[in-house]
């Protein structure tokens, strides 16, 4: 039985993306269980600086965060993944509850179990959901102060307009008086950026190509995966890394009963990763309904963590 019955949005997004003149599939579909495993492996690669840089920042700013956030809050993590950096935050601020939200259910539950083992007294309440859509938080956190946690520069996977919408959406979920700790990858030389998304071991390539395997498996596709290659580009005008799946020969294939053709050199656009300077990330946060309180950057200015507060909402006169 095809698995697309359980996720019609995947089918809709893939078919729409393959039909268009500029083929593109939303990046969130890279993260099935296998994709999440591969991304976790990516974060440990020597070329992939964001994870180790952000981890070091979390370690160095623990005391300041504890003072600014305070104990007995509810930590809401958007796109929790393997939650490898989360214990650093939880250990620093002594929260009352932890609510990880992730689209990959099995991966989410495994990560939640690990956090629960590390913090036995903490209420851990995982939510399997797409955090870009409506999410209802557990009633148990309704009376608590809330800290949103969005590490890993995931905000960069969205175009600026969508980033603003997402930040406003997070503000709606977290509510008045909430705070947000969010990671931003900074603009830097391409000799650092490109290898982070095109590693020598080929793990990022496997992560990107896994999308085609997922389409074949879940949408009754027959895409010849070996005809495609991982392709990474730096778009200087947009200050972003772009990931594509480039076609190496003319191919014809079917997905969900629909026929498609691609020529040599055609590509499927699979992911953005926008990079920011300090001014740009602060403007983005303000546009999204958040007031920056403080930020933490490494010595190279490769990565920045920002602690922000929900800006007041003013009723129309």
Question: Model regions: which residues?
Answer:
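Conserved beta-strand signature within the Rossmann-like core of class I S-adenosyl-L-methionine
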Residues: 173-187
């Amino acid at each position: 039985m095809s698995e697309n019955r359980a996720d019609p949005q995947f089918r809709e997004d893939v078919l729409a993306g393959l039909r268009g003149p500029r083929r593109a599939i939303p990046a969130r579909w890279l993260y099935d269980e296998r994709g999440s495993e591969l991304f976790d492996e990516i974060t440990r690669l020597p070329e992939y600086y964001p994870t180790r840089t952000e981890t070091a920042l979390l370690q160095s700013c623990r005391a300041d965060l504890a003072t600014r956030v305070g104990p007995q809050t509810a930590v809401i993590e958007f796109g929790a993944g393997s939650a490898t950096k989360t214990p650093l935050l939880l250990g620093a601020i002594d929260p009352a509850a932890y609510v990880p939200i992730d689209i990959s259910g099995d991966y989410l539950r495994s990560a939640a179990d690990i956090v629960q083992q590390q913090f036995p007294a903490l209420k851990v309440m995982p939510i399997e959901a797409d955090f870009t859509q409506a999410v209802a938080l557990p009633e148990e956190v309704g009376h608590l102060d809330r800290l949103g946690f969005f590490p890993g520069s995931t905000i960069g996977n969205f175009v600026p307009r969508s980033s603003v919408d997402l930040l406003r959406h997070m503000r709606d979920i977290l509510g008045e008086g909430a705070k947000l700790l969010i990671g931003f990858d900074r603009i830097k030389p391409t000799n650092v950026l490109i290898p982070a998304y095109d590693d020598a071991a080929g793990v990022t390539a496997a992560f990107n190509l896994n999308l085609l395997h997922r389409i074949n498996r879940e949408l009754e596709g027959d895409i010849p995966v070996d005809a495609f290659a991982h392709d990474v580009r730096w778009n200087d005008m947009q200050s972003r890394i772009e990931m594509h799946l480039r076609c190496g020969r003319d191919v014809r294939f079917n997905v969900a009963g629909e026929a498609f053709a691609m020529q040599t050199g055609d590509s499927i656009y699979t992911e953005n990763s926008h990079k920011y300077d300090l001014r740009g990330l602060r403007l983005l946060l303000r546009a999204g309904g958040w007031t920056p309180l403080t930020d933490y950057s490494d010595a190279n200015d490769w990565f920045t963590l920002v602690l922000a507060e929900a800006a007041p909402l003013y009723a129309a006169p």
